[in-house]
Amino acid sequence: LVKPPYSYIALITMAILQSPKKRLTLSEICEFISGRFPYYREKFPAWQNSIRHNLSLNDCFVKIPREPGNPGKGNYWTLDPESADMFDNGSFLRRRKRFKR
């Protein structure tokens, strides 16, 4: 299997953008990636820490705590509204600029 040409930031962004509420948990992001890209299905779960690391490290991702009464594990992650133009012309292959909050 060939590794997809996308960065982890691009993969996370794709996952969040396709979700109805534009927010996902770490496990939902990983489910999207492994469901969409067979390469990551084979390598699971070695890359999950890389996803976690990128969520925490990059300002374009914002952590949203779970609402009280919403059971489940982990916080939600969404995109900072200011980072919408992070990818050139909607192409996930090339990031336009590093986003800083």
Curated annotation (Swiss-Prot):
DNA-binding region: 3-97
Domain of life, per lineage: Eukaryota
A GO BP annotation: negative regulation of DNA-templated transcription
Pfam families reported in the protein's UniProt record: Forkhead
GO MF annotation list: DNA binding; DNA binding, bending; DNA-binding transcription activator activity, RNA polymerase II-specific; RNA polymerase II cis-regulatory region sequence-specific DNA binding; sequence-specific DNA binding
InterPro entries: Fork_head_dom, FOX_domain-containing, TF_fork_head_CS_1, TF_fork_head_CS_2, WH-like_DNA-bd_sf, WH_DNA-bd_sf
GO-annotated cellular components: nucleus
SS bonds (residue pairs): none
Primary subcellular site in the record, as a coarse category: nucleus
Localization in the cell: Nucleus
Entry keywords, A to Z: Developmental protein, DNA-binding, Nucleus, Transcription, Transcription regulation
Role summary: Transcription factor involved in regulation of gene expression in a variety of processes including formation of positional identity in the developing retina, regionalization of the optic chiasm, morphogenesis of the kidney, and neuralization of ectodermal cells. Involved in transcriptional activation of PGF and C3 genes.
Full protein name: Forkhead box protein D1
Protein species of origin: Rattus norvegicus
Gene: Foxd1
